[in-house]
UniProtKB/Swiss-Prot annotation:
One of its GO terms (biological process) is amino acid biosynthetic process. Its cofactor is FMNH2. This reaction introduces a second double bond into the aromatic ring system. One of its GO terms (molecular function) is chorismate synthase activity. Pathway: Metabolic intermediate biosynthesis; chorismate biosynthesis; chorismate from D-erythrose 4-phosphate and phosphoenolpyruvate: step 7/7. Keywords: Amino-acid biosynthesis, Aromatic amino acid biosynthesis, FAD, Flavoprotein, FMN, Lyase, NADP. Reduced FMN (FMNH(2)). This is Chorismate synthase.
Amino acid sequence: MNSFGIKFKISTFGESHGVAIGCLLDGVPAGLLIDEEFIQAELDRRKPGKSEFETARKEDDKVEILSGVFEGKSTGTPIAMIIYNTNQKSKDYSNIKDIFRPGHADFTYFHKYGLRDYRGGGRSSARETAARVAGGAVAKLMLKELGIEVQSGICEVDGIKSLEFDYESAKKSIIYALDSTKEEAQKEAILRAKNEHDSVGGVSRVLIKGVPVGLGQPLYYKMDAVLADAMMGINAVKAVEIGDGILSASLKGSINNDAIRADGFVTNHSGGILGGISNGEDIVMNVYFKPTPSIFKEQQTITCRDEEVDFSLKGRHDPCVAIRGTIVCEAMAALVIADMLLLNMGSEMSGVLTYYKK
């Protein structure tokens, strides 16, 4: 599937070394102020080539809105956005035309479709996520109208964990580090791996503030299930935790339960979600990225003819994909919340009457 969402839906298109990538947003309410500078700023946060901690591939990632906006506001019709690829180097991939790169989708795409675009991974490349960030920026504009904010930062790199989570500090950090006291060690780990022609993994921590009580469905479209789905659909993500996540399995119920008082919850072990429905507390997630599979060490693999070979990769790649990946996590989280808000409008008769009985 190339689409995500029910009421607020995003569809993306394009490949890493194709002419362009882009997205189509369907379900954006008419009258939303579309701040193109904000959308571009979000793309700039994710775009490659900004520092030595990212891929050397430089793309302007200039977004162009093709439809669905008139005089600065959404019209209620599909919003199409396009981002042209300008810095492809397809020749870097000529030596892997018939080779399956370990850790990539080459093997599975070939066996599913009978062919594959070997230039930078084609559709399976993280380049596609720029389109998601563009769509997520529009979702953020809608959430802003309701006082909802999605933030994120890096809380772990190569096993070096943050002891504090400062989201304002993360905005100023070149690697979006949540803990300034751990940032230098995390940077060193990334550069060390890069110099060794290797890569490291990392963890993005996502915080969603201002979510009202009641978003999410009780069974098959639970808030936490859909958020996990959205995160797991991001390239290189291997695990997602909501609230205390894995730690919950080692706690007693008396500790894990969030006590409730008249002024709200005492703790937030649940991460802002109970029974698949938001409880009004901050929604907190940890999203785990594996090490970038594109490394420059010699590796063993096979060809599409099942021949065993040793090969070395060429190209330009992120030494830690989590760094730019955290911006994609924000975008997907914003898309989920926007979708849940629209879905929830008809959950009570009072909501229907408020809208239609004027």
